[in-house]
């Protein structure tokens, strides 16, 4: 059974205020963010293949990056859809073409470059044991729910609160079945794969990941990634 990373790099980075270049292609130490992300999957032995879902206007650019950085596990680069959900669906369809039978798919954000091999392996193991894996971190602060009047309607028990991140992983046949049924019913804009699977009452299993597994969405996130990346490099160089 194959383990396939489906890496979503479909955003255009409006909140980053970048001029012309989508956020996933911004460079840190001479390497685009999306390449930093793919590198983790490339260097994880358990990963057999990677599918990249890309902004349609940047397909050639992404293919050039695959060649330039020798990302040999990237077997397909496909154009995204009109929504995040539809983009992921296109990536899953490409994964289906690669898989010889059912597969474990790890759906990941291209702008989460601080994932690690341990979490990827834990996702794969969780899918094999329970059918799903949603990489998450424990909430450090209290989560509250609000009503339409912006009044707090519920204070959530922090000891039971997690923040869902990525990868979010499933058997390919399971997530594709749900995606196809949802699309047939006009559901095309679920916020993420775990939300969609939850709508279909599928059991979802937590896999705890690192807090530094941030999604680079704003300039603050970008500079935080640079700082964390430099800290990791210094640890390797100086044995800190």
Curated annotation (Swiss-Prot):
Q: Which organism is it from?
A: Streptococcus agalactiae serotype V (strain ATCC BAA-611 / 2603 V/R)
Instruction: Report what the protein is called.
Output: Ribitol-5-phosphate cytidylyltransferase
Q: Which PROSITE patterns match?
A: ISPD
Question: What are its GO cellular component terms?
Answer: cytosol
Q: In which pathway does it act?
A: Cell wall biogenesis; poly(ribitol phosphate) teichoic acid biosynthesis
Sites annotated Positions ribitol 5-phosphate for the nucleophilic attack: 158, 215
Similarity comment = Belongs to the IspD/TarI cytidylyltransferase family. TarI subfamily.
The UniProt entry's GO biological process terms, in alphabetical order, are: cell wall organization; isoprenoid biosynthetic process; poly(ribitol phosphate) teichoic acid biosynthetic process
């Amino acid at each position: 059974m194959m383990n396939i990373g489906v890496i979503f790099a479909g955003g255009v980075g409006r909140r980053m205020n970048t001029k012309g270049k989508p956020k996933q292609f911004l460079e840190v130490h001479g390497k685009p963010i999306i390449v930093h992300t793919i590198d983790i999957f490339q260097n994880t032995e358990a990963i057999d293949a990677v599918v990249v879902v890309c902004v349609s206007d940047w397909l050639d650019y992404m293919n050039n990056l695959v060649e330039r950085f020798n990302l040999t596990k990237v077997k397909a680069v496909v154009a995204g859809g009109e929504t995040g959900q539809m983009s992921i669906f296109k990536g899953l369809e490409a994964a289906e073409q690669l898989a010889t039978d059912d597969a474990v798919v790890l759906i990941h954000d291209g702008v989460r470059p601080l994932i690690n091999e341990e979490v990827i392996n834990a996702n794969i193991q969780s899918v094999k044991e329970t059918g799903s894996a949603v990489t998450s971190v424990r909430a450090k602060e209290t989560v509250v729910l609000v009503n339409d009047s912006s009044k707090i309607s519920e204070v959530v028990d922090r000891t039971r609160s997690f923040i869902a991140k990525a990868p979010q992983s499933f058997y390919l046949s399971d997530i594709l079945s749900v995606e196809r049924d949802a699309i047939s019913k006009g559901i095309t804009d679920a916020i993420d794969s775990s939300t969609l699977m939850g709508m279909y009452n599928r059991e979802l299993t937590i896999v705890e990941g690192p807090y530094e597994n941030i999604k680079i969405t704003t300039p603050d996130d970008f500079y935080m990634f640079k700082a964390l990346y430099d800290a990791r490099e210094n640890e390797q160089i100086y044995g800190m």
